[in-house]
Amino acid sequence: GRGRGQTYTRYQTLELEKEFHFNRYLTRRRRIEMAHALCLSERQIKIWFQNRRMKWKKDNKLKSMSMAAAGGVGYHRP
């Protein structure tokens, strides 16, 4: 990532992604733990999660739209 904004190492990103996979919202305690583990500030963790949730929402919206366009797969009544 060039220009403004924080760049994260591959390891940090992987760990954050892994955590996000299990919880989209972090407790403060978990955030502190992650900040220590990844050598980031709590604020950086918080912002990463906010951005990740936005991206997730956008991706999900696209997914549900394409599902609808595909004729709502999975809604077959007998």
Swiss-Prot record:
Signal peptide: none
Record GO terms (molecular function): DNA-binding transcription factor activity, RNA polymerase II-specific; RNA polymerase II cis-regulatory region sequence-specific DNA binding
Protein name as catalogued: Homeobox protein Hox-A5
GO biological process terms on file: anterior/posterior pattern specification
GO CC field: nucleus
Keywords: Developmental protein, DNA-binding, Homeobox, Nucleus, Transcription, Transcription regulation
Family: Belongs to the Antp homeobox family.
PROSITE patterns reported in the protein's UniProt record: HOMEOBOX_1, HOMEOBOX_2
Annotated compartments: Nucleus
Residue ranges for the DNA-binding region feature of this UniProt entry: 1-60
Matching Pfam families: Homeodomain (PF00046)
InterPro entries: Antp_homeobox (IPR050296), HD (IPR001356), HD_metazoa (IPR020479), Homeobox_CS (IPR017970), Homeodomain-like_sf (IPR009057)
Function: Sequence-specific transcription factor which is part of a developmental regulatory system that provides cells with specific positional identities on the anterior-posterior axis.
CDD domains hit by this protein: homeodomain
Keyword Transcription: yes
Record carries keyword Mitochondrion: no
